[in-house]
Amino acid sequence: MKRFARKETIYLRGEEARTLYRLEEGLVRVVELLPDGRLITLRHVLPGDYFGEEALEGKAYRYTAEAMTEAVVQGLEPRAMDHEALHRVARNLARQMRRVQAYEAHLQTGELRARIARYLLFLADTPLSARDRQGIYVTVSHEEIADATASIRESVSKVLADLRREGLIATAYRRVYLLDLAALEREAGSALEAA
């Protein structure tokens, strides 16, 4: 088991893929750096999920994996895995594929406001969420929301300010409080599957 701090890189695009990973605790995102310098989130890895699947083929990692929270990760040697273990990996990757397809639809449908609402509701069901006296919140930056909604930070900040003015959310440093879940769900239009 290995611990990673928030924002720490687990592997980089182009590195030789020798290890398949299983997330034990926390939240990881798989990202790609675009030619224009923007970072986009391709998928979120939840506890129990496998990632770094390029190791199953003995290829280089195609994307970069980064911890979004403190994360505990188990490294696995694919050649040492038995048939049943590989079957568990395949089932998990199939489940992740369904989430990725839902995520693709999320990015391609609706205005930015709807995409942000869907993403905040999605994060509420991940290790990025917590509760305090003010209610349920997610720990996320404007930049991370932009990366996950095919947008830019400035546009995200404007939408969050509008949602805050309307009483749907409140914000603090790296926290977005979800004050009116029903209204956010109406804004979202459809759910982004977390599990």
Curated annotation (Swiss-Prot):
One Pfam family this sequence matches: HTH_Crp_2
Organism: Thermus thermophilus (strain ATCC 27634 / DSM 579 / HB8)
Ranges annotated as spanning the membrane: none
Source taxon at top rank: Bacteria
A Gene Ontology cellular-component term: cytosol
Keyword terms, alphabetized: DNA-binding, Plasmid, Transcription, Transcription regulation
Domain HTH crp-type: 110-182
The name this protein goes by in its record: Transcriptional regulator LdrP
InterPro entries: cNMP-bd_dom, cNMP-bd_dom_sf, Env_Response_Regulators, HTH_CRP, RmlC-like_jellyroll, WH-like_DNA-bd_sf, WH_DNA-bd_sf
Stored PANTHER family: CRP FAMILY TRANSCRIPTIONAL REGULATORY PROTEIN, HTH-TYPE TRANSCRIPTIONAL REGULATOR ARCR
Role according to the record: Activates transcription. Positively regulates PcrtB promoter upstream of the crtB operon in a cAMP-independent manner. Regulated genes include genes encoding DNA photolyase, phytoene synthase and cytochrome P450 monooxygenase, which are involved in carotenoid biosynthesis. Positively regulates the light-inducible gene cluster in the megaplasmid in a cAMP-independent manner.
GO MF annotations, alphabetized: DNA binding; DNA-binding transcription factor activity; protein homodimerization activity
Subunit and interaction comment: Homodimer.
